[in-house]
Amino acid sequence: MTVRETFRRTKIVATIGPATSSPDMIRQLIEAGATTFRLNFSHGTHTDHHRSICNIRQVSSELNQPVGILQDLQGPKIRLGVFKDGPITLNKGDKFTLTSRQVAGTSEISCITYDTLAEEVPKGAVIMLDDGKVEMVVEDVNVELGDLYCRVVIGGTLSNNKGVNFPNVHLLVSAVTEKDREDLRFGLSEGVDWVALSFVCTPEDVLEVKDLIAASGRNASVIAKIEKHEAIANMEAILSVCDGVMVARGDLGVEIPAEDVPIAQKQLIKTANRLGIPVITATQMLDSMVSNPRATRAEISDVANAIIDGTDAVMLSNETAVGKYPILAVETMARIAVRIEKEQDLKMQPIESMGRAIPNAISQAVGRIAMQLQAAAIVTLTKTGSTARNVSKFRPPIPILAVTPNVQVARRLQMVWGVQPLVLVSLPSARQNFEAALNLAQEMKLLTAGDLVVMSAGTLQDVAGSTDLVKVEFVSSVVGKGLSIGSGIVHGRARVAFHHLDVRDFNQGEILVIDRTDADFIEVIRKASAVITEEASLESHAVVIGRRLGIPVLVGVKNATGFIRDGEPLSINFNKGMIYSGSRTDDLAF
């Protein structure tokens, strides 16, 4: 089967917790399909998270597969205090006091982790506790004591530190707490790839975190978690300044009516797709798999519909953090994604308000060319990830191989729909980088000889969003290998010689292919871009002269003069000692 037939485009974010923090479990999660790991800083110590990060990086390196790490900051989550006699049960009609005073919890009162509670929550406000399992209404307020006197509308059980939400009440709490700042400093020092900001209300919340990251001298992308009613109202402005977005349906389903959550999810996904930023759909996607080996039909439909809506990634929380079946949960999610993508009528997505931006036009053209030519893959050269993201946002049905010299960029691209990142040392020219990318893709079994690929890049080095080049190319095959004397990638026409008279018309830049050389070949070697010899000695005449003239030599290539045809175009990767058959290239420069 081709890479196009087996490639999974939807990414999977798995939360690391006590059930999955060991190297062996992390390895199994990656092999099952996880592409990014989430660390929830509402739980665990810095020591715990450091250990998890080290394990993730170690396993990722061993598997030679870039894997992203997402640091999820706790944010200003408002919680109950501790109940002195354990969990309490409240019934409809019961009176209950919430206070900012530090008191031990009882069946009649509990402290709450918000100092200006009584000043900001008005009489008549609805309060949701423990994700809406318990509901109260404020009947009276005592600002001096900091008390809210409430009546229970929906009863239930409450225990220590459960969350408290105030739908339709605008609280003046900052989105970044002191704990978040401390956790952020730690995460940046550990090299996390993404920082998720909880309870975002305004674009200024996102910009505050971006400023903190910039001031640290580190580099991480910011995901805005949409879980407040204010964030829904400010959706466009928030998504315009963040690097990614998470549809955090848990708190969002308490902040707004639950029946509005699917509509908000679709709006968020559509907006993120238009802006070209990755979107994660999260919370209770396969929640029953915390304790059961099979997902419910409703959960499977939930994951499927998020993929159909256009989400870049789907996320597992408790399922992998503390669940009994973390590997099965990832495998289930991966199977759903593959099945839905196979069934979907994958086609290029029109983007509204695209404007006249050249990178957008080129990226859309790349996808259309790839579709028309039925290409095996789209190959993008990208140093910042911008080129790959631009192509991805048009949702081409062709796999996108994103080649980058930056391993952190590769890890971030593991959140982007349809993108397979490849890490490759940057070479001097786009042509050399393209050739090296195709060689690597063949070694990874992503492409085979004869595949047609469409490639894109920016001709301006190190400038994000400068995509302006399209190439159509057939993948060449490996024809031989030897021992390299030199480095880099060389292209040229092969000239096979058995005698120096065979190459009297040798042209500058051609590749000399010969059993062995002698003094009669010195002037030919001087013109050559490279020399291939069957002779294996590192002290041979070709090696000595090649070193003296600065000409790379590939030695010990068995029967080179037999299997290489005179005049055949070749590419030699001296970094790996590999010879590739020539390729046909059409360049479309804009």
Model features per residue range: what roles?
Residues 6, 14-18, 169-275, 279-283, ...:
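Conserved alpha/beta-domain cores
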Residues 15, 40, 72, 124, ...:
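Conserved, mostly hydrophobic/aromatic
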Residues 16-18, 35-46, 196-199, 245-256, ...:
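Glycine-rich phosphate-binding active-site loops on the catalytic face of alpha/beta enzymes
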Residues 76-177, 440, 446-501, 505, ...:
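Acidic, glycine-rich flexible loop/linker segments
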Residues 1-23, 30, 45-48, 54, ...:
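Expand to "…catalyze enediolate/carbanion chemistry for C-C bond making/breaking, isomerization
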Residues 31-36, 189-193, 213-218, 240-245, ...:
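Glycine-enriched alpha-helix->loop->beta-strand junction motifs that scaffold or abut catalytic
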